[in-house]
């Protein structure tokens, strides 16, 4: 009779089953990595934190090949022994199991000891690596602070020089504006001189050397004024460029000051500092926009740009100083030439006036002489009328002689000759009287012309000597012409 299954006691009676127990898999040594790896921080839960940390896999349950086939037909054993012999093992199985447990324990202890040693070495290596990296970071931060301090000093030095140059340029611009305004006074004087000289009369309204110099002076003053104003405009544009460069330097200096404060704070951080904390994922964020080369080049370019602006400013200041020197010399030379032309013209007009006055005096003397001559001629003519009347009366009386007494005797001839002579004398005197009267009229006209010319010359002298030269007694001094007040 056969029964399905066997009891625990009867299992000893059945044939021995070969149950091969597989050994534990070999455990691999951990791999030590020198690079930074993400790690789990205490107090945080992750998705795989619930899984057990096992160093080996549990061996799958091995089944005997005979058991798989015997399930269809259980062995034939006694019913009374099946329950007692079902869970029994052989001594060999027991020894093998104990040896297996001992070997497993020894393997676990060996692995634990090896892992402990490796962990201690790992701790030492990582501690040393962390300390070295922290020291290296501190050195790098210190070097960075030195670099920032160097560029800050360079930027501050350049900024101070640029500010000084801006002040100097502002002073030159103010001098140019003052000098341009100072030119208005001599320009107005020159224009007033031209306007006054337009009031000359007659022939004295001549385009003389004085007028040429005045026109040249007006043109020169306007040209100088225009040059100074144009240079002031160029300086104003350069000052705007300088202010732009100044703002760039100030912004760069401010950024470097902020970066220096931040890096000093980072440099002074220690493991025991109170303000340190975890900031997860910051190492994955790259918000930088420059590298050390471009960072240094940026400040260097700003300094070079500022130096170029200062060079342009220095060139403009030198140009302004040269312009001051040249224009002031030209204005003074032209002012002197115009005054010399005025003096020469005044001397010339004075000489002509003196000559005219001399001629007028002589003319007046001649008029007086002519008037006296006319008076004498008139008296002489009147004096000759008596003898002529006597002679003519005698001839008329002798014409009344009778007959033969009408003789052409010597008295008759003398009387006739006397009448002709006196008559000829009267005609001559009358002719001379008319000539003298014409001469007197000419002298009077000459006197009028001379007096008119003297009035013209007096008006010219009044304009040139009193009005024009009265205004031209003063001229802006050289310091005022170069913008110094």
Swiss-Prot record:
* Alphabetical GO biological process terms: cilium assembly; cilium movement involved in cell motility; flagellated sperm motility
Coiled-coil stretches = 114-185, 225-247, 307-385, 421-444
Q: Which residues form the signal peptide?
A: none
- InterPro entries, per this entry? Tektin-like, Tektins
Output the PTM entry: Ubiquitinated, leading to its degradation. Deubiquitinated by USP16, promoting its stability.
What would be one Gene Ontology cellular-component term for the protein? sperm flagellum
Origin: domain of life:
Eukaryota
Q: Which keywords annotate this record?
A: Cell projection, Cilium, Coiled coil, Cytoplasm, Cytoskeleton, Flagellum, Ubl conjugation
Q: What does this protein do?
A: Sperm-specific microtubule inner protein (MIP) part of the dynein-decorated doublet microtubules (DMTs) in flagellar axoneme. Forms an extensive interaction network in different conformations that reinforces the helix bundle composed by other tektin proteins (TEKT1 to TEKT4) and MIPs to anchor the tektin bundle onto the tubulin wall of A-tubule of the sperm flagellum.
Oligomer status and interactors? Microtubule inner protein component of sperm flagellar doublet microtubules. Interacts with TEKT3.
Q: What is this protein called?
A: Tektin-5
Which gene does this sequence derive from? TEKT5
């Amino acid at each position: 009779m056969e029964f399905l299954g066997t009891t625990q006691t009867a299992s000893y009676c059945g044939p021995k089953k070969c149950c091969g127990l597989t050994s534990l898999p070999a455990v691999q040594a951990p791999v030590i990595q020198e690079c930074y790896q993400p790690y789990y921080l205490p107090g945080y839960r992750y998705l795989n934190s619930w899984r057990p940390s096992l160093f080996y896999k549990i061996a799958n349950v091995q089944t005997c090949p005979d058991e798989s086939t015997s399930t269809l037909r259980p062995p034939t054993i006694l019913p009374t022994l099946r329950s007692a012999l079902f869970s029994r093992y052989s001594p060999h199985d027991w020894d093998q199991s104990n040896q297996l447990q001992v070997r497993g324990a020894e393997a676990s202890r060996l692995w634990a000891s090896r892992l402990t040693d490796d962990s201690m070495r790992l701790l030492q290596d990582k501690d040393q690596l962390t300390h070295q990296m922290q020291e290296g970071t501190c050195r790098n931060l210190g070097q960075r602070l030195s670099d920032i301090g160097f560029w800050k000093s360079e930027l501050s030095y350049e900024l101070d020089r640029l500010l000084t140059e801006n002040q100097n340029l502002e002073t030159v611009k103010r001098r140019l504006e003052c000098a341009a305004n100072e030119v208005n006074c001599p320009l107005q004087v020159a224009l007033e001189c031209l306007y006054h000289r337009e009031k000359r009369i007659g022939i004295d309204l001549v385009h003389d050397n004085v007028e040429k110099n005045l026109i040249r002076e007006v043109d020169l003053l306007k040209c100088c004024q225009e040059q100074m104003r144009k240079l002031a405009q160029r300086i104003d544009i350069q000052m705007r460029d300088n202010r732009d460069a100044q703002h760039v330097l100030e912004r760069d200096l401010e950024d470097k000051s902020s970066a220096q404060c931040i890096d000093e704070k980072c440099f002074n951080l220690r493991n025991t500092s109170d303000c340190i904390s975890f900031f997860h994922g910051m190492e994955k964020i790259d918000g930088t926009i420059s590298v050390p080369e471009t960072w240094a080049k940026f400040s260097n370019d700003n300094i070079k740009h500022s130096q170029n602006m200062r060079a342009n400013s220095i060139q403009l200041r030198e140009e302004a100083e040269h312009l001051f020197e040249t224009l002031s010399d030209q204005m003074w030379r032209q002012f002197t030439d115009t005054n010399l032309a005025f003096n020469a013209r005044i001397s010339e007009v004075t000489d002509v006036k003196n000559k005219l006055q001399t001629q007028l005096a002589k003319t007046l003397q001649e008029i007086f002489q002519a008037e006296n001559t006319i008076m004498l001629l008139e008296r002489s003519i009147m004096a000759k009328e008596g003898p002529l009347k006597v002679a003519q009366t005698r001839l008329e009386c002798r014409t009344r002689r009778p007959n033969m007494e009408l003789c052409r005797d010597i008295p008759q001839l003398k009387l006739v000759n006397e009448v002709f002579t006196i008559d000829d004398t009267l005609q001559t005197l009358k002719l001379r009287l008319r000539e003298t009267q014409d001469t007197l009229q000419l002298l009077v006209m000459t006197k009028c012309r001379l007096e008119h010319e003297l009035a013209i010359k007096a008006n010219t002298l009044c304009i040139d000597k009193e009005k024009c030269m009265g205004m031209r007694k003063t001229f802006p001094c050289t310091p005022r012409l170069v913008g110094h007040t």
